[in-house]
Structures are given as structure tokens and as C-alpha cells.
């Protein structure tokens, strides 16, 4: 075909050398099998597939944005975090929508995310904000974690405006700070009641007012 025989010999020789150590056929077979599996998953379980990719890249904001754009093109809804629906990583709800993973929220650690999900799975959804703060381990979910949840919309399911968490009472105290203090007092009182001779279950600690 008009090609220089020496050049062709050189190319063939290089290919032979490469094939001697590259295991090209088995390598290609393995990768084709992986490609088939991922293509099958994406075709039959698109939301779950995309959620898994997002979880894999949860610390790479640019990659997450690209994947969210791809979800949009695939008509898959992506929703923000929710303490009553999100998992530790990105997950899919009953409607086939992808929920932002709690561990992907800036300022939230993996231990905090796991504590929230484990408590919810063990004792049911959080009824309201005060039920959440009564039940969650404040050692795992500290003030910074609570602030991150408020800012990211993780508490939106409770019907409280995000800015209200940072509002102040007539003493100049931020609601988020009074909420943490309430949680600490409630959990301490509950522990003391459980350890008492009478084994009382009822704990009475006044909830802090929500700024309006």
C-alpha cells in the first residue's frame, strides 16, 4: 500500500515486544467485562449507578457538579441533604431521586453522618428538631456539624428557616447555641433519671424558643 517496509517492520516488532509482557488479550477481555457490567448498571439502575459514582467522588466538588449535570441530562432529580432521608453517602429514595450524602456536607465528618443514619434506622425518623437533638449523640454531631446541617438544608424537613438557626434571643444568644445547650441538658437529665432508684422515664427540660 505504498508504506515503507522498514517502518512496518519496526511497528510490528514493537507490537510483538509489547505483547510479550502486556497480556493484551486477557487485559482487553477483563476490561470489556467491566465495561459491560457498568453499562448494564447504568442502563438498568441509572439512579443507583450515578449515586455510587457521586459517593466515590464526594470530596471532588468539580466532579460532583459534572455528575449532577449528567443526572439532569438523564432526567434524574438530585436533591439536597435531609437528615430523615439521606444516607452517609449519596443514595436513592423511594421516588428514584438521588439524595445528597450527609458525609459530603462541608464540615460534617463520617462519624457524624453515620451516627445520624444509625439512630434513624434504629428508632425511626426524627419527628422534629428537638427530637433530633434529644436523640443524637452530641459527641459525634457537635456544634459545627449542626451548623453545617442547618446551612446545607439538612434540617429543612423540620420547617424552620435556615436563617432562624442563627437568630438571637433577647439575651443575645444564638438559637443554635441554645439548641446545643438544650440537647446537653436533656441528655444529662435522661441519663440521671435512668440511673436513679426510681428509674423515671420522663425528662422535663424546656425547649428554647425558635427566633421569628
Residue ranges and their predicted role:
Residues 1-212:
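Noncatalytic, beta-rich nucleic-acid-contacting surfaces in large DNA/RNA-processing enzymes
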